[in-house]
Amino acid sequence: MRALTLLLLGALGFGAKAGEIDQAAALKLLQQPETVLIDVRTADEFAEGALPGAVRIETPDLARHIGALAPAKDTPIVVYCRSGRRSSAAQDVLEGLGYSRVVNAGAYETLAPAFSPD
């Protein structure tokens, strides 16, 4: 019984698992000014439109560049891409590097309306 209680408390405390898209958590995290927003799409995709404040770093380059953006491992980080697949891989990379507050926001097109002035 104790193990079940701990399991349930853990599920409540940690939200989405690595790789899972959690746009609600991402939008909430983006209300915090210290949150780093990373777009892992290609340069061409980014040029077609990006979320305000997003920094473009493709997933293979994350390990090389993340330290400059987020030196503290508890920095909140939100990642997104075109469909959610690359942002899932990016979340895995960041968590593998020790970042503890990474949220996969999924697809740009489903996030963009939350940032429109309408």
Task: Write out the residue ranges for each language-model feature.
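Rhodanese-like catalytic fold shared by cysteine-dependent sulfurtransferases
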Residues: R2-T35, D44-P76, R85-D118
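Structural scaffold elements adjacent to functional motifs in cytosolic proteins
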Residues: L37-D39
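Metallo-beta-lactamase
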Residues: V79-C81
